[in-house]
Amino acid sequence: MSRKTYEKIANINGMFNMLEQQIIHSQDMAHFRSEFFYVNHEHRENYEALLIYYKNSIDNPIVDGACYILALPEIFNSVDVFESELPFSWVYDENGITETMKSLSIPLQYLVAAALEVTDVNIFKPSGFTTGMNNWNIAQMRIFWQYTAIIRKEAL
C-alpha cells in the first residue's frame, strides 16, 4: 500500500471513530448535534427548525435522520417542508415520484431514496443506496454517514 492509501484509510477510520463517539454520547443531544457534519450553517439552522416542527423526531431516530437530510439547503428550499405530515411525504404520491423530487440534483435524489430504503420504501431500481455509493462525492458520502449515525444513535 502506498502512503497515500494509508492516509485515506486513516482518515476514513478517524471519521468512523468520530461517528461512533457521536452514537456513544448521543444522550447529550446538544453536544451530539454540534458534532454533526453540516454542509453549511444554513443546513444546521434548517435541521434545528425541523426538529422543533417534527416533534416526534425526539423519540424516532428515523424521523430525526430524515430531518437532517431534509435540512440540506437544496432540498429545504425546494420543498414546502411545513406542509408535510412527515419529512419525506413530498417525495412521491399516488402518481409516483413528484416533480419536486425530480427537480433535485441526481446525487440528492439518491440520498433521499437511500434514506427511504431504511423504512422499506424503494423508489429506484437499482436502489438509491447502490446508485449513491457509486456516484456520491465525499461530501455526499459524509452526509449519508452522518445520517446513519443519527438513525442508529441507540445502537450502543
Range-by-range predicted roles:
Residues 1-107, 120-156:
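Extended, charge-biased low-complexity segments
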